[in-house]
A protein has these predicted regions:
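C-terminal helical subdomain
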Residues: 172, 192-226
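Active-site loop immediately N-terminal to the catalytic Tyr-X3-Lys motif
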Residues: 90, 139-143
Length: 263
């Protein structure tokens, strides 16, 4: 699908990956709408890219429905917004748990449902769900985050089959460890030894490629991480033993403590 001239709704536009996406989409000639819950940051992003803005908290059901209503004419949905959701499950309050599930899983599912109905009626559209390699492999102290990303992956792959033949494509883009954005940039923690990182720009390129080529799944990660995640998905017990031997507890604690305030 050609992005040029298409109306694109981008959620999570104020973060590192979101900013890179906004830049790529604008360069491709998209008619961009960005959404977020922080008005000042959203306005800055809109000013930078000449985008329309819709203020919405994706943890609030009425805001999600309102966002879909205001963007009913969108040709492309890029569901990029997500909370980090790191930490042991027992450390979460019920409210924090609900918020992570709402933002990371329920909101993209609901937006996809509401907007795809209009896309199917027009016989044209594309939905991109930005997941994570954490949707393929489980790691310690990310049980809630893994749950949302595993769920998003299953949803995306099944929805693609449901919409086959309607003119509406569905793609899942799964970044690996991203430098200059996300948990490593926010916490100062180092990625595991021997694992390379990717840039927000590479993730944005993966999203654009997914739309242009109607790709089912795009894994934006170096070869070693793609192989490790594939093995972990097939042999979780083996992956658990490898992670235990890697002695990642210090890095994990650093990430969890730094992200606690973002729940």
């Amino acid at each position: 699908m050609d992005i040029s001239g298409s109306k694109v709704l981008l959620t999570g536009a104020t973060g590192g990956i979101g900013s890179a996406l906004a830049g790529r989409l604008t360069a491709q000639g998209a008619r961009l709408t960005v959404s977020g819950r922080r008005e000042e940051a959203l306005k800055a992003a809109a000013d930078a890219w000449g985008a329309r803005t819709v203020l919405a908290d994706l943890a609030v059901r009425s805001d999600v429905v309102g966002l879909a209503d205001s963007c009913a004419d969108a040709d492309v949905l890029i569901a990029n917004a997500a909370l980090p959701a790191s930490g042991d499950l027992m450390d979460y309050t019920e409210e924090q748990l609900d918020r992570a599930l709402d933002v990371n899983l329920r909101a993209p599912v609901l937006l996809s449902q509401l907007l795809s109905a209009h896309m199917v009626a027009r016989g044209r559209g594309h939905i991109v769900l930005v997941g994570s390699i954490s949707g393929k492999a489980a790691t310690k102290s990310t049980s809630l985050y893994n749950a949302t990303k595993f769920g998003l992956r299953g949803f995306a792959l099944a929805l693609r089959q449901e919409l086959r033949g309607t003119g509406v494509g569905v793609s899942l883009v799964q970044p690996g460890f991203v430098r200059d954005a996300g948990m490593f940039a926010a916490t100062g923690a180092a990625p595991p030894k021997g694992i390379r990182t990717v840039t927000p720009g590479q993730v944005a390129d993966g999203v654009v490629r997914a739309v242009h080529r109607d790709r089912c799944e795009v894994n934006v990660a170096p070869l070693e991480l793609r192989l490790l995640s594939a093995v972990a998905g097939q042999f979780p017990g083996f992956a658990e033993r490898i992670q235990a031997r890697a002695d990642l507890d210090g890095s994990v604690r650093q990430i969890v403590e730094a992200q606690r305030s973002h729940r």
